């Protein structure tokens, strides 16, 4: 597989059926052994599943212009455990917090953000906040939306 992406590809695991429901024939690549438990059908009705997390992320991308068109600003660029960034457009700011660590990581909101005033749009774990921050769970992601009020004239 050297020089190709074949080593990173496996058939989509649609169900717990033979060959993960991918084909009734012989798949080009072997199906992952975890397909009876990890498959689309098993995650379909679980609101906390990875499948539904990504569906919600895609919905936000389609519905919120700030996700698509907002200017980008990164926070904590030297961190090798957190990827934190802002998207800003008009009166909206989106704060995205992603942990790339298998271990818990302390997170403190950047200056100008009060997590309690933001609307938590997407989360992969809990929504616990303490002292304008939280301790991430392994590989946790959160997305907050902040809207500013129009200034009085």
Report residues per predicted region.
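Structural signature of nuclease core domains in nucleic-acid processing machines
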Residues: 95-100, 127
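Solvent-exposed beta-hairpin/edge-strand motifs
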Residues: 110-125
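C-terminal beta-strand-rich structural cap/linker in extracellular carbohydrate-active enzymes
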Residues: 130-153
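Surface-exposed beta-strand/loop patches in extracellular or lumenal glycoproteins
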Residues: 98-114
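Loop/helix patches that line or flank the sugar-binding groove of alpha-linked glycan CAZymes
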Residues: 1-94, 102-106
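Residues that form or immediately flank small-molecule/cofactor binding pockets and catalytic motifs
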Residues: 17, 125-126
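Short, exposed beta-strand/loop patches in secreted or surface proteins that constitute
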Residues: 72-76, 127-129, 134
């Amino acid at each position: 597989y050297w020089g190709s992406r074949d080593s990173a590809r496996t058939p989509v695991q649609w169900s717990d059926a033979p060959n993960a429901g991918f084909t009734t024939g012989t798949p080009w690549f072997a199906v992952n052994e975890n397909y009876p438990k990890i498959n689309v059908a098993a995650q379909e009705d679980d609101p906390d599943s990875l499948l539904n997390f990504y569906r919600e992320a895609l919905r936000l991308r389609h519905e919120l212009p700030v996700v698509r068109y907002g200017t980008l600003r990164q926070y904590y660029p030297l961190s090798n455990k957190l990827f934190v960034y802002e998207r800003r457009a008009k009166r909206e700011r989106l704060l995205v917090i992603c942990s790339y660590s298998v271990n818990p990581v302390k997170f403190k909101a950047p200056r100008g953000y009060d997590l309690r005033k933001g609307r938590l749009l997407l989360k992969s774990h809990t929504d616990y906040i303490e002292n304008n921050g939280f301790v991430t769970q392994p590989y946790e992601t959160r997305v907050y939306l902040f809207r500013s009020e129009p200034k009085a004239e």
